[in-house]
Curated annotation (Swiss-Prot):
This is Cystatin. It is found in: Secreted. Expressed at a low level by the venom gland (at protein level). The record marks 29 as: Reactive site. Disulfide bonds join 91-107, 120-140. SUPFAM superfamilies: Cystatin/monellin. Residues 29-129 form the Cystatin domain. Keywords: Disulfide bond, Protease inhibitor, Secreted, Signal, Thiol protease inhibitor. It holds the Pfam family Cystatin. Negative results: the recombinant protein does not inhibit calpain-1 (CAPN1), a C2 family cysteine protease and legumain (LGMN), a C13 family cysteine protease. Does not provoke cell death (PC3 prostrate cancer cells). It comes from Hoplocephalus stephensii. Residues 1-26 form the signal peptide. Transmembrane segments: none annotated. The keyword Disulfide bond applies.
C-alpha cells in the first residue's frame, strides 16, 4: 500500500511547492519590469526626451544619459513608466525647427563644473494601431 502512494505523493508535493513560490507571471493591467534595452522602451524614452525638450522652458536642450528603470502596463495599448537621467547640453533652443532626438543626443555636454543632471519620471502611452504615442505624465528634479 505504501509503495502505491509514492507516485502520487511526489507530484502533489511538487504542486504544493510551486503554489508557494512568488508569482512571476504578468498580471493583466499590472506593472511589469522591462529591460531598458527593449526596442519599445527605447522608442518610448526617445519620445519622452523629445517631448520634455518641447514642453520645458529651458533655454538649452537636455539629452538622455540613461534609462534607470522601465516598467510597462497593458492598457488600451501599452503604458511605459520610465525613470531616466537627462543632462543639459550646450545646444541652445533657437527659433525655427526644433531638434529631433538623434540631433539632441549628438549635442555636446558643458564642462563638468557646469553640468546639470535631472532625474525624470515619464509615463508614455503607446497605441501603435492608431499611430499614436503621447506623454501622459512628467516630473523632473
Amino acid at each position: 500500500m505504501l509503495h502505491s502512494q509514492l507516485p502520487v505523493a511526489a507530484p502533489l508535493r511538487l504542486l504544493c511547492a510551486l503554489l508557494l513560490l512568488p508569482s512571476v507571471t504578468m498580471i493583466p493591467g499590472g506593472l511589469s519590469p522591462r529591460s531598458v534595452t527593449d526596442p519599445d522602451v527605447q522608442e518610448a524614452a526617445e519620445f519622452a526626451v523629445q517631448e520634455y525638450n518641447a514642453l520645458s522652458a529651458n533655454a538649452y536642450y537636455y539629452k538622455q544619459l540613461r534609462i534607470v528603470e522601465a516598467q510597462s502596463q497593458v492598457v488600451t495599448g501599452a503604458k511605459y513608466y520610465l525613470t531616466m537621467e537627462l543632462m543639459k547640453t550646450k545646444c541652445a533652443k533657437t527659433t525655427g525647427k526644433p531638434k529631433v532626438y538623434k540631433e539632441i543626443q549628438n549635442c555636446e555636454l558643458p564642462p563638468k563644473a557646469q553640468q546639470e543632471k535631472l532625474t525624470c519620471r515619464f509615463q508614455v502611452w503607446s497605441r501603435p494601431w492608431l499611430e499614436k504615442i503621447e506623454l501622459t505624465k512628467m516630473s523632473c528634479n
